Design a protein with these regions (language model features):
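A short, Trp-centered hydrophobic/proline-enriched beta-strand micro-motif
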Residues: 21-36, 75-79
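Extreme N-terminal tail/first-helix region
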Residues: 2-29
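Structured helix-beta-strand junction loops
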Residues: 25-26, 71-72, 117, 127
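A short, aromatic/hydrophobic, helix- or strand-capping loop or linear motif
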Residues: 35, 79-82, 123-129
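A generic structural signal for short beta-strands and their flanking turns/coil linkers
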Residues: 27, 42, 51-53, 71-75, ...
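Charged, gly/pro-rich active-site loop segments
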Residues: 8-11, 90-155
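A short mixed-secondary-structure module that forms the rim of ligand-binding clefts
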Residues: 47-85
Length: 155
């Protein structure tokens, strides 16, 4: 994995660990999709794979969100650790994960991963009217201290 910071590539091990920590600590993300060139955002409960290549979330199939994602598979997701106070200007980290999304089978491994983070969402996940979605991350753009921006290519 290569990390691009200010036009230069560097080792991604430290940044990857910071990203893993954020992904494990945060329970919610803002999912952005679009329809007819209009953006649409939602909060979703998510879980990421250990290698950070995939982000999983659940949505009812009868929603606008599901319809938009199945017609245009390109989405992005923002995960952050802001606390809504002035310390955020120096301490907050925000991550944008971009890629393509698909509905996937509710396999034992993915269910275990998702419910390990969100055990209170078992009924929602297991409902026949819910779809398990997988975002295959193309890249992460990581912003910290509002000016330090790093890009992590996952391909």
């Amino acid at each position: 994995m290569r990390v691009k910071a200010g036009g230069f590539y560097m080792s991604g091990s430290d940044m990857k660990e910071r990203l893993k920590s954020l992904m494990n600590e945060q329970k919610l993300a803002v999912l952005a999709s679009s329809h007819k060139d209009e953006p649409y955002t939602n909060l979703v409960a998510f879980a990421s794979s250990d290698d950070l290549k995939y982000i999983f979330f659940v949505t009812p199939v009868s929603t606008r969100k599901y319809s938009y994602m199945t017609s245009s598979r390109k989405v992005s997701m923002m995960i952050d650790n802001r606390s809504n106070n002035e310390n955020d200007f120096k301490d907050a980290m925000a991550v944008n994960a971009s890629g393509s999304v698909n509905e996937v089978e509710k396999t034992d491994a993915i269910v275990k991963l998702y419910l390990g983070k969100h055990p209170y969402l078992r009924d929602f996940l297991e409902s026949p009217s819910s779809a398990l979605m997988r975002l295959e991350v193309k890249n992460y753009i990581i912003a910290s201290r509002f000016q330090n921006v790093v890009e992590m290519d996952m391909k």
